[in-house]
Amino acid sequence: MITGPTSGLGTGFARRYAIDGHDLVLAARDVERLERLAAELHDEAGASVEVLPADLAIAADRAKVADRLASGVRILVNNAGFGTSGEFWTADFQSLQSQLDVNVTAVMQLTHAALPPMLEAGTGTVINVASVAGLLPGRGSTYSASKAWVIAFSEGLANGLGGTGVGVHALCPGFVRTEFHERAGIDMAGTPSFLWLDVADVVRDCLADVAKDHVVIVPGLQYKVLTTGGRMVPRNLVRAMTKVVRRGRGRT
């Protein structure tokens, strides 16, 4: 199952898994795009695709997806997530709450539903899409915090699941060429070109590291350098560096 498959990394994972011969369950709120993607994957790769319309900001829809996961899947990609623009103190509170419902609550609830049948089968993979923003402090207070939670959650589960045949991984990409920033209303003008990653490369690197049983996965040499350096220098210096890199790109 892949959540948020109708654009960006979600589409990248869906296409890769379809090409690799997997049957898919795709959950997203945009029904038209969801059905169009399902048809494309069937025509291009012969994949059997089950569509599950759901808005993960809504409790009833999260429960519907969790019920489907409880019947068993081999792989869960918790990809759905979003950011918002502007400052925390002026942002609409309901938008902030919806962000946490999707970025945190849905990840926890869907993983909780998926693990029991995986453990019973003795095999399974959960990929939680986090972000470099969860490893490095930045302007995005609630977004960064939500992704830091995903990383800590994934690492804790991975430790607890050792030896079971079930793996949990946190994918931490940097800036990826997707609709993410445009949808959030975040101005990315002036972002250095070397910081941008391609969807196909991120998916490829992620699955390669999953096969190596890496838990925290950071695609791209540039981001490996940034995150490794961020762990070695004082936090106040890291904050100063991220202010320079992300200047003018307000995110909440």
Residue ranges of each PLM-predicted region?
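Conserved NAD(P)H cofactor-binding loop of Rossmann-fold oxidoreductase domains
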Residues: 79-84
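Conserved glycine-rich Rossmann-like NAD(P)H-binding loop of the short-chain dehydrogenase/reductase
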Residues: 21-37
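Residue(s) in the substrate-gating loop at a strand-loop-helix junction
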Residues: 131
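Active-site helix of classical SDR
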Residues: 111, 146
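Conserved glycine-rich cofactor-binding loop
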Residues: 6-7
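Substrate-binding pocket helix/loop in short-chain dehydrogenase/reductase
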Residues: 87-98
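C-terminal helical subdomain
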Residues: 170, 190-226
